Structures are given as C-alpha cells and as structure tokens.
Amino acid sequence: MSNYVNDMWPGSPQEKDSPSTSRSGGSSRLSSRSRSRSFSRSSRSHSRVSSRFSSRSRRSKSRSRSRRRHQRKYRRYSRSYSRSRSRSRSRRYRERRYGFTRRYYRSPSRYRSRSRSRSRSRGRSYCGRAYAIARGQRYYGFGRTVYPEEHSRWRDRSRTRSRSRTPFRLSEKDRMELLEIAKTNAAKALGTTNIDLPASLRTVPSAKETSRGIGVSSNGAKPELSEKVTEDGTRNPNEKPTQQRSIAFSSNNSVAKPIQKSAKAATEEASSRSPKIDQKKSPYGLWIPI
C-alpha cells in the first residue's frame, strides 16, 4: 500500500522521469522529419540539375542538327562553300608561306560537278593540286594523296630537248637522210642493190630545181615534153596530159580502137578551138555513125 501511495504521490520519481522520456521521443521525431526534408530537398535539387543538363543537351543537339541542315543546304545550293570561315585561316597561311594568288582557288568547271557531291570543298583540293604540280609531283584522284612524278611531260622528252610546245618536225634534208639509211638497210636485209620504191616514197623535184634545169639548157630553148619516166620513177610534173581520143565501135570487131584523125582535121580543130560537138556534155565522148 505504501508503494502504491508513493507511486501516486505528486513528488514521486516516476512523475519526474516522464517528461524526459517524452522530450527524447519528440527530438527523435524532429530529427527524422528534418532528415526526410533534407533528403527531399537534395533529391529535388538533383532532379533540377539533371533536368537542366538534359535541357541543355537537348538544346545543343537541336542546334547542331539545325547547323548540319543549314550546312547541307548551303553545300547544295551555294557555289561559294569553299570560302568558309573555318578554312580561311589555313588559306591565309598558305598565301603567306607559298605565295599563292587567288586564281588557284577558283577551280575550273570540270571540278565543280565532282566537288558538289563530295563533303570536301573544291578549293582546298584544287589548291593542293596546283601546289603539287608546281613542285613537280603528280596529284592522283580527288583525295589528298600526292606521289612524286617519275617521268616528265612528253614535251620535255623531245629529241632536241627543247621546251617549246610545238611538236617535233623533221626537215626535208633529214627525211632524205633517213630514207637513204632505210634503203641501205633494206638492201642488206634482202641482198639486192636495186629496190623499187612505192609512189608515196618517191621524191618529186621541187619547182625551183625544174626551173633552173629548164633555164640552163644548152640550146636556149625549152625541152620537149614527153611521157618518159624520170630517173626516180615518177613522171615529169611539167608535162601536160594528152587529149582524150575518141573511140569507134563496129559490129565486126568487138575491140574498141581509137580513131586516127588526119592532119587537116587536127589543124582545123586547133585553129577554131570550138568543135561542132561539145565533148564535155556527153559522158562517153564523141560518137561517130557507122
């Protein structure tokens, strides 16, 4: 009973200890609440930061896509894509270093169709090609590979070693010498001394030589023209072609024979110079009735 009274008495130790226990429980609750609030705040801040980063990445991606589209359109529809800002610095350096002028940057029409379909600009490739040619190297294809040139151009490999652009031509004297050498070689190979040359290889005397030969005649008169072949095997160029003779046909003889005109008829025809029947009109010449 005394214990019961002591417990219920206002000054008992149980009543003194009860508020301390309530205070400890409240503090634990407050700490848990503060922890949950701080965790929620940190999660919110983390989500905000992640959303910011994601929005920034999306914006950057959209900007890069728009730039790519713009560049593609610019490459398709513009001819001055090679003069972009990204490569202006390298060109300025090349101008200072190698002394290029602006005519190397303008590519000809044959390279423009290729460069539009490729990602590389035409100005850089053409500039590299011009620089390689200037240094004596050969530029292969549309890429950047440059190989040293093994042989020089065909113009530099001429017999006379001249750098002129005109092709090499032989003079008449050189041709005659080569023809004589070929004759001797053919005679040795065939074992014959006299070789009949074709008409294309026979030499025709020039007009000066023929005029000199006519002027230095012993009698002072021009030599008579004949159908004899010269020593080289060609006819004399000064001789005139003979007149076409008329042909007579007969039923007894099937072989056509030319008609022999009398001297009187020949003189009359030569004096008049206008025959009664025009031979040029008829394709078969003069026809004589039998």
Swiss-Prot record:
GO BP term, example: spliceosomal complex assembly
UniProt keyword Ubl conjugation, yes or no: no
Biased composition annotated in UniProt, kind: Basic residues: 32-123
Biased segments, Basic and acidic residues type: 150-159, 224-238, 266-281
Pfam families from the UniProt entry: RSRP
Biased composition regions of type Low complexity, renumbered to the chain: 19-31
Composition bias type Polar residues, residue spans: 239-255
Keyword Phosphoprotein (UniProt): yes
InterPro entries, A to Z: RSRP1
Phosphoserine: residues carrying this PTM: 12, 107, 109, 274
Keywords in alphabetical order: Methylation, Nucleus, Phosphoprotein
Main location per the UniProt record: nucleus
Modified residues (Omega-N-methylarginine): 135
Cleaved signal peptide residues: none
Subcellular location: Nucleus
Mutagenesis or variant effect for residue 109 to A: No effect on interaction with spliceosome factors
Region (Disordered): 1-125, 150-169, 204-290
Modification note: Phosphorylated. Phosphorylation at Ser-107 and Ser-109 mediates the interaction with spliceosome proteins.
Family of the protein in this entry: Belongs to the RSRP family.
Function: Probably acts as a spliceosomal factor that contributes to spliceosome assembly and regulates the isoform switching of proteins such as PARP6.
Protein name: Arginine/serine-rich protein 1
